[in-house]
Amino acid sequence: MATKIRLARAGAKKKPFYQIIVADVRSRRDGRFIENVGTYDPNQNPAAVKFEEAKTLEWLGKGAQPTDTVKQILKKAGIWEKFVAKSV
C-alpha cells in the first residue's frame, strides 16, 4: 500500500484549515486516512504548524512520501532535516 503525507482541508468557506494526514494514494483529499500527524493553519500570521514529530518521523521511515507542500512545511518545522540525518 503506497502512502502519502498530505493536507486534508477543513474549516469554513474562505477560511481554510488543514489537517496533515497519512493516507493511501488512492483515497480522496478529504476522504479516508490512516493517521492524523498534525495541523496547518495558514490564516494566522505567521502560519501555525503543529506536528506530532515522532509519528511523522515514523511514517517517513516507513516510506510515506510527502507532497511538495507538506515537504516545504516539514522543512520549515525542522523535521525534514532530522529525517534526512537519520537516513544517512
UniProtKB/Swiss-Prot annotation:
It holds the Pfam family Ribosomal_S16. It comes from the Bacteria. GO terms for cellular component: cytoplasm; small ribosomal subunit. SUPFAM superfamilies: Ribosomal protein S16 (SSF54565). Keywords: Ribonucleoprotein, Ribosomal protein. Disulfide bonds: none annotated. One of its GO terms (biological process) is translation. GO terms for molecular function: structural constituent of ribosome. PANTHER family: 30S RIBOSOMAL PROTEIN S16 (PTHR12919), SMALL RIBOSOMAL SUBUNIT PROTEIN BS16M (PTHR12919:SF20). HAMAP family: Ribosomal_bS16. Belongs to the bacterial ribosomal protein bS16 family. This is Small ribosomal subunit protein bS16. It comes from Geobacter sulfurreducens (strain ATCC 51573 / DSM 12127 / PCA). The lineage of its organism: Bacteria, Pseudomonadati, Thermodesulfobacteriota, Desulfuromonadia, Geobacterales.
